[in-house]
Amino acid sequence: MAATATHADEIANHPLISRSLELAGAGMDVVGYNYMTARHEPDGERYPNRVIVGSETYPPEIARNWDIVERCAHVIGDFTWTGWDYLGEAGVGVPAYRPGEGSFVAHYPCQLAYVGDIDITGFRRPASYFREIVFGLRKDPYITVQDPTHYGQQPMQTPWVISDNYASWTHP
């Protein structure tokens, strides 16, 4: 999935996907779209009685997705992957600065996906504050910093990585 993410909108709008969704969606009260945000608005026009939910979406796209939810009455919500971090898919959310460091090739002892708004121990990560701001639930700023050892470098990351920022003023 990570390799196709840059073309996700094109794939979502492919005629084969359209035909499959037309058949499957006809028998559903609510149709869940995984990583197909590009279909939310046009499918509302094509199928005026269809109710859509973003059943799995990329965390960095929350501002785009939530704008669609607020503007389109037929889109009833968005479920970002994922709220709470978990064991498995080790490293999918780990940004890397050298080939072979993060993502799905993260080295041992990496066991967490590292994609949750809440980490495995129950602490909120910066992404959760960004989401809170997008939802209009937070007006105060939330300030994060990047590790200065990577200053000026562009991370290699999967589409599930928002950033490598953290809420701290000290660095190890």
Task: Show which residues each predicted segment covers.
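Substrate-binding clefts and catalytic carboxylate motifs of secreted carbohydrate-active enzymes
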Residues: 1-172
